[in-house]
């Protein structure tokens, strides 16, 4: 069933991308991501064009859901590793964090987006699939209490998105919007 849901989600994203004429051009950053270079087993993947957002569009969506963001450099330049940028983030990634906010009721602060400086890979920050968030007791309890532990410090949601607790933040990979 999850495979069918994922396939339908991917197909819907492809149709949306075609309808609004978004670009599928994706760049890569240096390095590799051995944990998240491939989706979990059973995740349907189809070569499609993801719907990309500008930084302004993404922040408007985050703001409307009560989600905050911050950066160590106080900036949003995608080419500066001390900034937090949402330029070229996938629409489904923003919808995924909005779904997490709504479902958990937790305050969420995003600390990493599509800016340079993260590991590369198909499902990377640079390519718009990943966000980092601050740790909080509320968010920790929600993720660890509602999602399936898949080893180490990783949890998988029912929708197949991956939540990886990396020391001082959550590194979240959104393959889809998580039931938006």
Regions found by a protein language model. Give the residues of each.
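Acidic helix-start/capping segments at beta-turn-to-alpha-helix junctions
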Residues: 110-121
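Catalytic cores and adjacent binding grooves of peptidoglycan-active enzymes
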Residues: 121-180
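Active-site acidic/histidine clusters and adjacent loop/turn architecture
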Residues: 41-109
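Secretory targeting and sorting signals
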Residues: 1-27
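Conserved beta-strand termini and adjacent loop/short-helix elements that scaffold enzyme active sites
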Residues: 72, 111-113, 175
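Cleaved targeting-peptide boundary
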Residues: 28-36
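Surface-exposed flexible segments
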Residues: 35-39, 48, 123-126
């Amino acid at each position: 069933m999850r495979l069918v849901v994922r396939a339908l989600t991917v197909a819907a994203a492809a149709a949306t991308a075609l309808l609004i004429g978004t670009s599928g051009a994706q760049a890569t950053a240096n390095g590799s991501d051995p944990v998240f270079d491939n989706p979990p087993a059973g995740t349907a993947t189809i070569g499609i064009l993801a719907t990309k957002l500008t930084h302004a569009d993404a922040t408007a969506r985050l703001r409307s859901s009560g989600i905050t963001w911050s950066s160590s450099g106080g900036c949003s330049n995608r080419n500066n590793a001390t900034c937090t940028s949402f330029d070229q983030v996938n629409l489904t990634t923003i919808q995924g964090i909005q779904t997490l906010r709504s479902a958990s009721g937790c305050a969420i602060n995003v600390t990493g987006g599509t800016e340079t400086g993260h590991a590369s890979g198909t499902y990377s920050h640079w390519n718009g699939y990943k966000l980092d968030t601050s740790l909080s007791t509320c968010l920790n309890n929600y993720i660890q209490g509602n999602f399936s532990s898949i080893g180490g410090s990783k949890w998988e949601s029912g929708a197949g998105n991956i939540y990886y607790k990396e020391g001082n933040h959550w590194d979240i990979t959104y393959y889809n919007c998580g039931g938006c």
